């Protein structure tokens, strides 16, 4: 716990007071007495009265302008601020509440609860700006993070302490997949999750919260039994809040990893909005834009966030980041910079969702750097490749089937199609968090069971079984017994 205090120590023995000299939208210029300038990233607080109501605006120092003046970005609306108002330098960067008391609660970028459930029952705080773990602290072992979801564990496995990109349009099951992962990490790994809603719709944040309460991920009756903390900085917030809300969520996750020594899942929805907010702030600060109008510091900002997400010898943060691709252009600097950090991609397919195959993870488009024989083992690798080849061949044959029908195919191709259809159905799985809606109990399938099941399908042991018996089941024994 000593590290916490070293970050929070002020450079001055007492806080200094400055005053606002200029306000342009969410950007403030503040002058301080000589020798009392705040550091970059220090938190400033402006207090005032509006309509007989006291308000306070927190800002973060971004630039030193000279002449004892700093430029800061506000974390909330600047309505009611005027030139000449007093500004308090807190002497440290923004700190947010952390620990078990944050589970089941919703916070804003400042770490203030916004769910009307009263104050957070903790005195422990962590600063949102922290250095990435030093090299000796890192855990360099390559190990798979088992999710209990067949299609993910077999074909695009997650790395413990890795970063995964989640791609998918509206209505293909992103939210349900996220909730299932939160549920499974709690049950199988004794871990917790932090969800950072960065610049997305308020309605989506509300829907997610309601669905989490319904599915039991957030326990209303006993909040302490919840499995996730939520941090929201939605589309209507100023760019300063959207730029920093990801760091607030990350600080909460780092506490669970470094102090509680747990495995943590960190969800960021959406990483593109983090870049977008940084671009807005950069323009407001008067920096020269780079390619496609993005901020010149794009790689640095992305790197400082992503490098803190890693495995250490104490615990791990595995991050799943929804990636919005503007105009479906993968070469756009924002997604291109994100891809450089990803270990795996999980692509959700509308075609599979339309067929009723959930989770609608595309087995051919999803990738992982972990799928190598020296990491996952020869058997896992061979079966994953066999599954992909069978599905790829089925995809190639679909045009012929549509025109000529199945009967015109060779015996070998007909067998491939039959097995591919069984594989496709066996990649579906009932989820714990969907029990409320589907009525069928959820299934956690271990990696060993997953490999055994697909090995039996590929070897032809189950050619005599109808394909429908492979649909929405857990392990292969359920198929055989049905």
UniProtKB/Swiss-Prot annotation:
Cellular component terms per the entry's GO annotation? chloroplast thylakoid membrane; mitochondrion; proton-transporting ATP synthase complex
Record bears the keyword Chloroplast: yes
Q: Which UniProt keywords apply?
A: ATP synthesis, ATP-binding, CF(1), Chloroplast, Hydrogen ion transport, Ion transport, Membrane, Nucleotide-binding, Plastid, Thylakoid, Translocase, Transport
Q: How does it assemble?
A: F-type ATPases have 2 components, CF(1) - the catalytic core - and CF(0) - the membrane proton channel. CF(1) has five subunits: alpha(3), beta(3), gamma(1), delta(1), epsilon(1). CF(0) has four main subunits: a(1), b(1), b'(1) and c(9-12).
Q: What is this protein called?
A: ATP synthase subunit beta, chloroplastic
Q: Where in the cell is it found?
A: Plastid, Chloroplast thylakoid membrane
- What GO terms in the biological process aspect are recorded for it? proton motive force-driven mitochondrial ATP synthesis
Q: What class of enzyme is it?
A: translocase
Where ATP is bound, by residue? 168-175
| Organism, scientific name | Gnetum parvifolium (Small-leaved jointfir)
Primary role = Produces ATP from ADP in the presence of a proton gradient across the membrane. The catalytic sites are hosted primarily by the beta subunits.
The similarity comment for this entry is: Belongs to the ATPase alpha/beta chains family.
Q: Which InterPro entries match?
A: AAA+_ATPase, ATP-synt_VA_C, ATP_synth_F1_bsu, ATPase_a/bsu_AS, ATPase_alpha/beta_chains, ATPase_F1/V1/A1_a/bsu_N, ATPase_F1/V1/A1_a/bsu_N_sf, ATPase_F1/V1/A1_a/bsu_nucl-bd
| Membrane topology of this protein | Peripheral membrane protein
Q: From which domain of life does this come? A: Eukaryota
Q: Does the keyword Plastid apply?
A: yes
- Name the Gene Ontology molecular function terms of this record: ATP binding; ATP hydrolysis activity; proton-transporting ATP synthase activity, rotational mechanism
Pfam families, A to Z: ATP-synt_ab, ATP-synt_ab_N, ATP-synt_VA_C
Q: What is its EC number?
A: 7.1.2.2
In terms of Gene3D superfamilies, this protein maps to: 2.40.10.170, Bovine Mitochondrial F1-atpase, Atp Synthase Beta Chain, Chain D, domain 3, P-loop containing nucleotide triphosphate hydrolases
